[in-house]
C-alpha cells in the first residue's frame, strides 16, 4: 500500500483490511498518494456523494437525455450507482441537474434541476454571474419516483445536502445576485436564511456529525475576477451564530467536505491556475493541512464515505492528451483507511 508520507505522519495508525477494488479496475499507486482507481462503467461525472451504506453514490452524470448547452454539448442528470460501477439508476430524465445528496435513511434523495423551468435561460452552473435561475430543489425515492418539489420561486437554488440525522436540509440560494446559505426542515417547510452578507458569496454547505455545525466556503464578489478566485472555508451553527474561518490563506480553498470523525475536512486548493489538489484540513485550527492528491490537472469535489474508509473525487487524470483543464472528468475512489477518518466510537 502506497501511503502519503505527510498524511501518514499525522494520521492515527489504523489496522484494517484494504478496501475491495472493483473487478476490472486498475489500481493506481502513484507517488505520494494512497491506492486509488477510476470507477468503471460510469460516464463523465462530477460531485459524487456516498449513501449511508458507504457503497452507493449519487452524482450528476453526463446524459444524452439532458438539455444541451449553448455549444450543443450534452448536460448532466442525476444518477445513483455503486462505487464498483454497477446498479446505475437514472433519477431524473429531463432538464439539467446540479448537486444531489442521500438522506441518511438511504431511501430518499434530494437533488437540483432546471427540469420545470426550461423556458428560462439555461445559465451556467460554473459562473456565479450567470447561475441558472430556474434551478429548484426536489426530493424523490431511490427509483426517482414520488418526486416532490421543495422550492418554487425561479431563483437559483442548489448546493443542497442533508444533516446526518435527516432532520435538516441546507442549501445555497441566490437572491438579487447574492448567494447565501439557507436551512429548512427535511419536508421543505420552515425555510430560514443563515447568512446575510453583501460581498461574501456562500455555498457548498455540509453538516458536521453533530447536526448543528455547518461547513461551507465563501468568496468575495469584489475578488471574483481574480483567478483562481480567493476562497475561505468556514463553519457556522445551524442558527446562524458562531461563524469561524477554518482556512487561513488568501488563495483558493474550495469544495469542503467534513469527515465522519468530526475532526477533519477535505477541501481543494489551487497549486497553480491549472493544478488543483485535494487536501485534508484540521478543525483544530492549528494543524497545517495535508495534501492527499498528487496529479498535474484537476482534482476536486472530494467526499468521504460514512465509514471513513473511502474518498470519492472527480479528476481529469484519465482524460486523453489535449483535453482541457476540466474536460473528461471521471470519478475516482481512494482507500483512505490509513487516515483514521471514521466515526468516533
Go through each PLM region and give its residues:
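Residue-level detector of Asp-centered blade-edge/turn motifs that repeat once per structural unit
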Residues: 52-53, 104-105, 164-165, 209-210, ...
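Multi-bladed beta-propeller domains
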Residues: 17-44, 80-96, 140-156, 184-201, ...
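Long, low-complexity intrinsically disordered segments that are proline/alanine-rich
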Residues: 1-18
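Hydrophobic beta-strand positions that form the internal "hydrophobic ladder"
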Residues: 57, 109, 166-169, 214, ...
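Right-handed parallel beta-helix/beta-solenoid
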Residues: 166, 198-203, 211
Amino acid at each position: 500500500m502506497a501511503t502519503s508520507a505527510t498524511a501518514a505522519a499525522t494520521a492515527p495508525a489504523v489496522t484494517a483490511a484494504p478496501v475491495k477494488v472493483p473487478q476490472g479496475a486498475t489500481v493506481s499507486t502513484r507517488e505520494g498518494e494512497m491506492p486509488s482507481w477510476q470507477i468503471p462503467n460510469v460516464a463523465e461525472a462530477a460531485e459524487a456523494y456516498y449513501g449511508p451504506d458507504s457503497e452507493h453514490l449519487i452524482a450528476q452524470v453526463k446524459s444524452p437525455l439532458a438539455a444541451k448547452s449553448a455549444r450543443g454539448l450534452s448536460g448532466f442528470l442525476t444518477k445513483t450507482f455503486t462505487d464498483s460501477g454497477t446498479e446505475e439508476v437514472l433519477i431524473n430524465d429531463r432538464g439539467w441537474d446540479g448537486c444531489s445528496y442521500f438522506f441518511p435513511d438511504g431511501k430518499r434523495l434530494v437533488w437540483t434541476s432546471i427540469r420545470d423551468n426550461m423556458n428560462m435561460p439555461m445559465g451556467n452552473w460554473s459562473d456565479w454571474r450567470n447561475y441558472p435561475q430556474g434551478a429548484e430543489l426536489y426530493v424523490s425515492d431511490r427509483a426517482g419516483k414520488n418526486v416532490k418539489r421543495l422550492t418554487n420561486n425561479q431563483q437559483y437554488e442548489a448546493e443542497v445536502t442533508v444533516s446526518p440525522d435527516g432532520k435538516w436540509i441546507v442549501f445555497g440560494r441566490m437572491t438579487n445576485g447574492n448567494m447565501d446559505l439557507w436551512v429548512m426542515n427535511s419536508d421543505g417547510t420552515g425555510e430560514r436564511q443563515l447568512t446575510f452578507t453583501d460581498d461574501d458569496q456562500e455555498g457548498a454547505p455540509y453538516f458536521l456529525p453533530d447536526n448543528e455545525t455547518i461547513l461551507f466556503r465563501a468568496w468575495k464578489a469584489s475578488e471574483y475576477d481574480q483567478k483562481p478566485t480567493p476562497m475561505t472555508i468556514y463553519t457556522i451553527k445551524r442558527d446562524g451564530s458562531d461563524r469561524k474561518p477554518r482556512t487561513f490563506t488568501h488563495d483558493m480553498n474550495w469544495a469542503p467536505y467534513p469527515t465522519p470523525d468530526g475532526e477533519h475536512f477535505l477541501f481543494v486548493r489551487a497549486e497553480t491556475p491549472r493544478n488543483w489538489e485535494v487536501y485534508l484540513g484540521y478543525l483544530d485550527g492549528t494543524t497545517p493541512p495535508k495534501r492527499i492528491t498528487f496529479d498535474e490537472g484537476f482534482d476536486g469535489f472530494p467526499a468521504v464515505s460514512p465509514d471513513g474508509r473511502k474518498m470519492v473525487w472527480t479528476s481529469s487524470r484519465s482524460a486523453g492528451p489535449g483535453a482541457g483543464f476540466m474536460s473528461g472528468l471521471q470519478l475516482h475512489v481512494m482507500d483512505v483507511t490509513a487516515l483514521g477518518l471514521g466515526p468516533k466510537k
